[in-house]
Amino acid sequence: MADFIVKDLSLADFGRKELDIAETEMPGLMALREEFGASKPLKGARIAGSLHMTVQTAVLIETLVALGADVRWASCNIFSTQDHAAAAIAASGVPVFAIKGETLEDYWAYTDKIFQFADGTCNMILDDGGDATLYILLGARVEAGETDLIAVPQSDEEVCLFNQIRKRMAETPGWFTKQRDAIKGVSEETTTGVHRLYDLHKKGLLPFPAINVNDSVTKSKFDNKYGCKESLVDGIRRATDVMMAGKVAVVCGYGDVGKGSAASLRGAGARVKVTEVDPICALQAAMDGFEVVVLEDVVQDADIFITTTGNRDVIRIEHMREMKDMAIVGNIGHFDNEIQVAALKNHKWTNIKDQVDMIEMPSGSRIILLSEGRLLNLGNATGHPSFVMSASFTNQVLAQIELWTKGADYQPGVYILPKALDEKVARLHLKKIGVKLTDVRPEQADYIGVKVEGPFKAEHYRY
């Protein structure tokens, strides 16, 4: 029986061609293959990967394999898979379980499958959003007697998650605890997943070390900002074909993702307003030239609304009922709870095309909802460009190597890769875009108290 689930294996050739192109735009990952391909530092690592199954992720997967790892993969979002990329990975012999538009039930079943290694346990997790980590740790707590944790689901997603946990416990008693105890570490890709890890550690519920990849400078200041700057408008255009020039757009949140999103919309000619709860970010937005407002003051006038906060209930049902006819509503934060999509269930929905729905309000006005409130840049388009994802994924590979080869040096907790590795990731990407670094002379290095080879900034420096 084939150890993969993809939409159409015949798409593998198309996927392979796109992988070949992506490799030329991902110098960091290709450099790691060259540096570590012979020594295979990930030999023996059995990595359960939960991250958007895109062309760029396929290059990451093949890099992990080239470095010796045994890998099983699922997407971390029901809409983000590129089916031809999944097919290419399946055809290469790597077990992958991902279909664009999969159901929530399938999503959690596929998450379960990434842990089904031949000997019964994985020993590493590569996560994006924290769902793979959540699945194992929540299941282990239920096995330990905390059955109330899955007694009352609060969403459709929790219904499917809790059912999958019960199913696995019935089929293989003690499975979650066995998996948890075998895991040596997790590397986490995104802001939301990192929040989960810090919360687990604070409560004493994180049993293994975790590396916070998101807060590597070469991830958060590049993927989150420059990636969103290109992919947000791409997703809106593919979904709606609307002209953004002259439109009023509201970006909720001005962290790194919000900064990139506001720049994306401004670059398309939109008149951008920003909402913020953090006074520092609000001041940044204002000094970047954006009007900082509260949502209630602009909800009737704006044409496009984008959430970027990582928080819940940012755009609520009362906001959507006040929006102008055919306002576009979308999210580029990791989860779908930034917009109160569940509150729209009893309204009239008209599906326009995949991941584009028109929803009629009681007043007769309509909104266009993108990707059901999930990541629109991946649901309605193909996500960030390969080059910026190379920086993020180079950090992921380095984090996996660090945890696998030096795991004994780490206690349970959340860690960040050292500055020297952050600078290495940046350095690996300079030649591709024609950057030439100025060399620091020894007397200059002495003057500012650094080594000639770096790192050039203190750990606390904010870029």
From Swiss-Prot:
Write down the Pfam families for this protein, in alphabetical order: AdoHcyase, AdoHcyase_NAD
> Which cofactor does this sequence's record say it needs?
NAD(+)
* Source organism superkingdom: Bacteria
Q: What is the lineage of its organism?
A: Bacteria, Pseudomonadati, Pseudomonadota, Alphaproteobacteria, Rhodobacterales
Task: Please report the organism this UniProt entry assigns to the protein.
Answer: Cereibacter sphaeroides (Rhodobacter sphaeroides)
Write the protein's name.
Adenosylhomocysteinase
Q: Which residues bind NAD(+)?
A: 190-192, 224, 253-258, 276, 311, 332-334, 377
**Alphabetical list of HAMAP family matching this protein:** AdoHcyase
What are its E.C. numbers?
3.13.2.1
Q: Which reaction does it catalyse?
A: S-adenosyl-L-homocysteine + H2O = L-homocysteine + adenosine
Q: Which gene encodes it?
A: ahcY
Q: Where in the cell is it found?
A: Cytoplasm
